[in-house]
């Protein structure tokens, strides 16, 4: 009962504070109409934020009150001596105990599934913000993504920055960037921004800005992404000139040897792939690409572009829609996702534990990337992924960060110094470094 009483007291207190705050807000709005100077406008903004914060807290307390009342009802409900719930259809008790009640009132099955997003609406929404707030939000959801998601799970957060504002009747108000942080039970609307969709759309729209500021997701850093993107134009040019094992050109008698050599190159295979992609466009994604081309975005139009690999710097969970019709781009993202799985498998293999515990440490980035990308309307070309792996797989594995990069000789020397010093100052057994 004390919990319910405490929550009710908090609700009453916040309602009183909200009444006062709303009255102060009305006073400030009237003052702005009479004396529209900066000081009074700033006061108005501060009072708007206070009212918004109090409304959020009050809504949270009311949710907690509803949950507490629901729990209390469940606790006081008389138990059936047979152990069977009154509305259970079983005639005899199951061997399983009763678990949680899953409330599905909030789920709308008419909405598209989580794999489907309205990329045009999402893209137009994001492009409507200033670059600083977009990149800062990207940093919070990629470089510091795990912490941000953990702290805000199950809520709809708002990013705020001084560069993002809108003028309404001469009053400068913050223009918040909204991102939903879903739980496993959440159903997302087609136009709703989630961390995965946000990283996907921003990486596809602003790779040059990401490259200049070196914004990178930790999961990309540990697979050696920094090494991979170094000298990218030269790297991809050399790759394109190499012989492709999947091409067997039909050579007519008298064809010059130089032309025959050219027809066997990876470049020709990529040209063929581009022809296939050009025939499989989706109208909404074409609209997004056209809209982005008229503004600030810097989406790559060729895999040889210097900023092309930076589309994947923040580990989007699928190929960004703005470059999905560029030959080799979606497959490059799949290559990175395989590298993430390879590194996690290596890390799981070197840890101590049972086979089951090791399996839990493995990941399925590739399967997730494949499923999400193909739901956007294209099939990935597995041969291109294989070409990437043959060309760069070995050197990328050699540049994995495996958390134990200390030289064996250095480790041995450091351990001997530790052992010696511990023996000098105590009779305890020295720990291993």
Curated annotation (Swiss-Prot):
Assigned protein family: Belongs to the hantavirus nucleocapsid protein family.
Region (Interaction with host RPS19): 150-175
Span list, region Disordered: 69-89
InterPro entries: Hanta_nucleocap
Annotated segments matching region Interaction with host DAXX: 377-433
Marked site positions, Important for the endonuclease activity: 88, 103
The name this protein goes by in its record: Nucleoprotein
Source organism of this protein record: Puumala virus (strain K27)
GO molecular function, one term: endonuclease activity
Biased composition (Basic and acidic residues): 69-78
Record localization: Virion; Host cytoplasm, Host perinuclear region; Host Golgi apparatus, Host cis-Golgi network
Region (Chaperone activity): 1-100
Chain residue ranges for the region called Interaction with host UBE2I/UBC9: 188-191
Keywords on record: Capsid protein, Chaperone, Coiled coil, Endonuclease, Helical capsid protein, Host cytoplasm, Host Golgi apparatus, Hydrolase, Nuclease, Ribonucleoprotein, RNA-binding, Viral nucleoprotein, Virion
Positions of region (Interaction with glycoprotein N): 80-248
Chaperone among keywords: yes
Entry's Gene Ontology cellular component terms: helical viral capsid; host cell Golgi apparatus; host cell perinuclear region of cytoplasm; ribonucleoprotein complex; viral nucleocapsid
Positions of region (Homomultimerization): 1-79, 100-125, 377-425
Annotated region described as Viral RNA-binding, given as residue ranges: 175-217
Coiled-coil intervals, chain numbering: 4-71
Alphabetized Pfam families for the sequence: Hanta_nucleocap
Renumbered residue ranges of the record's region Viral panhandle binding: 1-175
Function field: Encapsidates the genome protecting it from nucleases. The encapsidated genomic RNA is termed the nucleocapsid (NC) and serves as template for transcription and replication. The nucleocapsid has a left-handed helical structure. As a trimer, specifically binds and acts as a chaperone to unwind the panhandle structure formed by the viral RNA (vRNA) termini. Involved in the transcription and replication initiation of vRNA by mediating primer annealing. Plays a role in cap snatching by sequestering capped RNAs in P bodies for use by the viral RdRp during transcription initiation.
EC annotation from Swiss-Prot or TrEMBL: 3.1.-.-
């Amino acid at each position: 009962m004390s919990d319910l009483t405490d929550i009710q007291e908090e609700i009453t207190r916040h309602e009183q504070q909200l009444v006062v705050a709303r009255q102060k807000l009305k006073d400030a709005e009237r003052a702005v109409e009479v004396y529209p100077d900066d000081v009074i406008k700033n006061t108005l903004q501060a009072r708007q934020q206070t009212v918004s914060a109090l409304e959020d807290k009050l809504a949270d307390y009311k949710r907690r009150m509803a949950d507490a009342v629901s729990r209390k009802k469940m606790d006081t409900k008389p138990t059936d001596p047979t152990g069977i719930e009154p509305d259970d259809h079983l005639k005899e008790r199951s061997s399983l105990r009763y678990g949680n009640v899953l409330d599905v009132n909030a789920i709308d099955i008419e909405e598209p599934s989580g794999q489907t997003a309205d990329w045009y609406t999402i893209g137009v929404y994001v492009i409507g913000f200033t670059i600083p707030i977009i990149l800062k939000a990207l940093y919070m959801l990629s470089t510091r993504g795990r912490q941000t998601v953990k702290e805000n799970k199950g809520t709809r957060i708002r990013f705020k920055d001084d560069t993002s504002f809108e003028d309404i009747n001469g009053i400068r108000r913050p223009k918040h960037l909204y991102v939903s942080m879903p739980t496993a039970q959440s159903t997302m609307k087609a136009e709703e921004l989630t961390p995965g969709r946000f990283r996907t759309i921003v990486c596809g729209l602003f790779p040059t800005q990401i490259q200049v500021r070196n914004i990178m997701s930790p999961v990309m850093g540990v697979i050696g992404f920094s090494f991979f993107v170094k000298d990218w134009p030269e790297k991809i040019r050399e790759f394109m000139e190499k012989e492709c094992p999947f091409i067997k050109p039909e050579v007519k008698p008298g064809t010059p040897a130089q032309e025959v050599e050219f027809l066997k190159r990876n470049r020709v295979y990529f040209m063929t792939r581009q022809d296939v992609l050009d025939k499989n466009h989706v109208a909404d994604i074409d609209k997004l690409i056209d809209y982005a081309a008229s503004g600030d975005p810097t989406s790559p139009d060729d895999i040889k572009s210097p900023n092309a690999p930076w589309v994947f710097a923040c580990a989007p969970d699928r190929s960004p829609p703005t470059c999905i019709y560029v030959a080799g781009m979606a497959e490059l993202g799949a290559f990175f996702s395989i590298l993430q799985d390879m590194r996690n498998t290596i890390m799981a293999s070197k840890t101590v534990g049972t086979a089951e515990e090791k399996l839990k440490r493995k990941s399925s980035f590739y399967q997730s990337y494949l499923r999400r990308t193909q739901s956007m309307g294209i099939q990935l070309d597995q041969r291109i992924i294989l070409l990437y792996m043959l060309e760069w797989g070995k050197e990328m594995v050699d540049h994995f960060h495996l958390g134990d990069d200390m030289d064996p000789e250095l480790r041995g020397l450091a351990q001997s110094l530790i052992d010696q010093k511990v023996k000098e100052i105590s009779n305890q057994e020295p720990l291993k470094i």
